[in-house]
Amino acid sequence: MRNFIINRKIIFLTQSEKSKKAKVKRQKFGNIFTFYLLPFTFKSFAALRLCVFALILILPSFAQKIAILTPEKNGQSEKFAEKLTDSLSEKFKVLDSSLSETAFLSSNPEKPFNLTVEEAKIIGAAIGCEFFLLVRSENLRRYSFEKKEYFESFAAVYAVSSRTGRLVFWKLKTFNGYKSADAERLLFDSIADLAKEISGKLPNIAKEEFNEKVSKLEEIPDENSFEAKNFRSPLPYRRISPQYTAIANLYNIAATIDIEVDFDETGKILLTKIVRWAGFGLDESVTETVRKMNWRPATRNQKTLPIRVLLRYNFKKLEKEE
């Protein structure tokens, strides 16, 4: 039986709590990036939007700028990133790795493989790319009853949208061998197929995000605010804990998953968005669990109302006691 811990208490984050770190990040970069908007009439703005949409449809994917980063500095991660860069350069404009790395480090992400969407958007803006890829690769010694001692060479690739900050593509590639070099060779031989898969997905994601409509809903009010008076948050009738996935357990992943949930006035879930991601199946586990639960609607002065809430789940593997 796998040992892990998930906080069972559902944490509701208020708007001020959510935006506190984002404000600090934006202030940090506010002096670096300045954007000027020219006045547009409604018709000219609509025409401009149509032109931009047409350009997105007709421009080839190589016009999109991407950055490939290795937050964990080890030889295999850097070697994998170099080979992935070579494969993706045929379809995308891959930015200089040293410049991208400098911009990435300037944002000082505490957990680079467990970013919030706000942190990711700031990083993407600092780098100046449409997407950035985070690469983590290692060669591990494994043991099993069937194979006894063997080596596993793996690479986890995170593709992140600079526009939305969301994790839009995640892939784990693993290969085994009785020798370290054999496992590594098999992994590197798979890079061409991985690059092809990434090249097929990112341009389509860019089109989808451009057409995405953002709905506005009231959010959980601050505790001492006027809006909090006689307000009651939505709650599940029966709480369910999301599963700590087997793949997360195997790689000893500790992560926080934040999910934004839109409820209608009856407590029905309209939309869910992962706004702090981690990969390894944890995002999907949280989404599936939240959607399984039946929710009591939010109320103010005993009247039900639609609401947007932010829920947080913490995952951590527990080490076996000696």
Question: Which residues fall in each region the model found?
Answer:
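Short, low-complexity, charge-dense intrinsically disordered segments
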Residues: 1-9, 13-29, 38, 48-54
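Sec/Tat signal peptide C-region and signal peptidase I cleavage site
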Residues: 59-63
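Charge-biased low-complexity segments
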Residues: 65, 154, 168-170, 179-192, ...
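Short beta-strand->alpha-helix linker/helix-N-cap micro-motif
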Residues: 65-73, 85-114, 223
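Solvent-exposed loop/turn segments connecting transmembrane beta-strands
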Residues: 74-79, 179-183
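Extracytoplasmic/secreted envelope proteins and their assembly/folding machinery
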Residues: 77-85, 117-121, 191, 195, ...
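Short, solvent-exposed, polar/charged sequence segments at loop or secondary-structure edges
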Residues: 95-144
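Amphipathic beta-strand/beta-sheet edge segments enriched in Tyr/Trp
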Residues: 133-178
